[in-house]
Amino acid sequence: MPDITIKERFSALSNLPRFFKLVWQTSPSLTLTNALLRIIRSALPVAILYVGKLIIDQIVLLSRGTGGDHYHLWQLVTIEFLLAILSDALSRATTLVDSLLGDLFSNHTSIQIMEHAATLDLDQFEDSEFYDKLERARQQTVGRTVLLSQVLSQVQDIITMAFLAAGLVVFNPWLLVLLFIAVLPAFAGESYFNDKNYSLTRRQTPERRELDYMRFLGASDETAKEVKIFNLSDFLTDRFRFLSDKFYKDNKQIAVKRSLWGTLFAILGSLGYYAAYVFIIFKTINGKLSIGDLTFLAGSFRQLRSLLEGILSRFTAVSQGAIYLKDFFDFFNIKSKIKPSVNPLPFPNPIKEGFTFENVGFRYANSERWANRHLNFTLYAGEKLALVGENGAGKTTLVKLLARLYEPTEGRILLDGHDLGEYDLEELRAQVGVIFQDYIRYQMTVSQNIAVGNIAEKGNESLIINSAKQSLADILVQRLPGKYEQALGKRFNNGVELSGGEWQKIALARAYMKNAQLLILDEPTAALDARAEYEVFQRFSELTKDKTAVLISHRFSTVRMADRILVLEKGQLIEVGSHEELLQKNGRYAELFYLQAKGYQ
């Protein structure tokens, strides 16, 4: 990625208003408190310097016996003491508010990312470029309040600098010119190296994700068995070491150059400061300035130099942060391609005709290969339909289209004569009970694991238990120490790990949590033994008596119970019929059936 130009840097500042709106939404009271604390703090350095000047002038007068007032001197000392205490207290208060606001902002934006991600399409999550944007957005949820602190510090320092500069201008305006000349190289250097860091960070995003993935694979309960059995530890650690060493070398190269140039720029800044200091000393020796003036001006120039360096370098940091904010907002600019209907139709209850696929095709973004193509069939109301085909035939993609997790690339899907897109999307999803073959093993309680099938009913204990009974999961739950409150998985304390078949029964219970009109089961018994599979499908036949159901399975003992069977190959429909009809056709279905049956002989 090319380095950031000055124009792009200033353009990135347009992200700040949107950022401040987010911060304000996080906590208006803390944001306002932060701003007020910094405004008050901005006047204190000048006040402390000026009181210090008055103290020194009083001491000089008293030591020479040419005037002065002891009482006034101690008043000034007391005032300076109180100002110093106030400055320290305000500094600590600002740090506290920054910390609290930072934690709240991180939580607030993390929740926003989760909420926005929930609105996006499934196929977007299957795109690597999307994951890069998601990863960069996640990185901005932590530490972005540093940007708020930087901007407010910028305002605070500008106000302080204005007070200090006024004193120098009255004395000699050329000192300000000297000051700017001294700090400009440091500003240019910071700007240059911040650009380099940003460009490097963006280039590293895909490899960063791979690094995190290697870290997960190398130390996870989900991968531990295969890592040991296949002796993958060296392979994973070698890859992790290669990537981390590469990051280290790239970052080190920039850090070393930045340090060397930074040292040179610091020397130039010191030369400017001491040139001004020598000038002020000569003026004091010649009697044109008092000792108090000397300390005030020298202190003002020193602080001005520090403030100006901070303001200029912080500008690069602020603009840099604003550029990173673009990554954050870019994620929120991603919108779902599945648009809800403006005037949605209510979902039919009950379904009268069924679902009709009219020349439906689907392919993933940036892919030339069609996952499904030329699909023409009807899933009738109350029908039990099975999908059969080899891996990659497009079976799971088809049911995702049916549940409107995907939008057809071509053609359309009708429900009772109306395009599926005309129905209320939330109502449609509420009427679909689905369990995919890659179901999630939630590291939660049994009750929560089942309730995710209809989270609105998470407090409905009787519904959860009934769903478990329908999937035959209740028998295994009763054997667990904590019953329905037993934590599952080994990620947290006191969790119990289940077998593959037991997890599948828990997952199957989720599909029964909804009184859905359409039930989709994708390899629902793949991990079950023969007896358990038979019992599950006996129960399944009873429970789906008046419902429409789609079943995906490689087991012909399972699919033969369906009213009709669709055979898919390379994403296209090649055969349709009942088990007996398809055997009589002696086509692809019959070939696969006899091939599997031969294995049992």
Predicted segments with their positions:
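Cytosolic ends of transmembrane helices, especially the final helix of ABC transmembrane type-1 domains
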Residues: R203, L232, A276, L297-N333
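Loop segments that connect adjacent transmembrane helices in multi-pass transporters
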Residues: Y131-D132, T205-Q253, P346
